[in-house]
Amino acid sequence: MDEGKKSSALDHALRLLAGRAHGRAELESKLKKKGFDSESIAKALARLDELNLTDDRAFAQSCTASMARRKPEGRLKTRARLKQKGLPDNIIDEALNGCDQTELCRSAAEKKLRTLPASPDQKKKKLITFLKNRGFDWETIRETVKLVLGEESARSDQLD
């Protein structure tokens, strides 16, 4: 492949990185989809490594924090999303160890609670289903539901 194509792979990777952070595997995949050959991709990724523009650990931390702010999800869902981005298991584990699953679950539950019907039984059932679908484990869900419904009950008792 000619020199123009090699720099083109690097240029394309730099444009991708200008938009948002990417993991190494994600960049490689996008460059392959764009039609660059393996040699051009390898050279472009090597150059990005030299420039310290690819850091899977920082990328995993950034993704995890962003997902937690935008849409709090449990460990299982977050792991699956990071895996889709091509991150290795050890880096995913490091990123997830920095997350407080109880706090994420509570945040999601409190936000959802405002939209649920008034019936306490329906509220509890829908909240459990919602949190389960968000990928939280049963123990965290159980503790969180007990806590947020207890707080809500205490607040409504104070108003009476």
UniProtKB/Swiss-Prot annotation:
<comment type="similarity">
    <text>Belongs to the RecX family.</text>
</comment>
<comment type="function">
    <text>Modulates RecA activity.</text>
</comment>
<dbReference type="Pfam" id="PF21982">
    <property type="entry name" value="RecX_HTH1"/>
</dbReference>
<dbReference type="InterPro" id="IPR003783">
    <property type="entry name" value="Regulatory_RecX"/>
</dbReference>
<dbReference type="Pfam" id="PF02631">
    <property type="entry name" value="RecX_HTH2"/>
</dbReference>
<protein>
    <recommendedName>
        <fullName>Regulatory protein RecX</fullName>
    </recommendedName>
</protein>
<keyword id="KW-0963">Cytoplasm</keyword>
<dbReference type="Pfam" id="PF21981">
    <property type="entry name" value="RecX_HTH3"/>
</dbReference>
<dbReference type="GO" id="GO:0006282">
    <property type="term" value="P:regulation of DNA repair"/>
</dbReference>
<dbReference type="InterPro" id="IPR053925">
    <property type="entry name" value="RecX_HTH_3rd"/>
</dbReference>
<dbReference type="InterPro" id="IPR053924">
    <property type="entry name" value="RecX_HTH_2nd"/>
</dbReference>
<dbReference type="GO" id="GO:0005737">
    <property type="term" value="C:cytoplasm"/>
</dbReference>
<dbReference type="InterPro" id="IPR036388">
    <property type="entry name" value="WH-like_DNA-bd_sf"/>
</dbReference>
<dbReference type="InterPro" id="IPR053926">
    <property type="entry name" value="RecX_HTH_1st"/>
</dbReference>
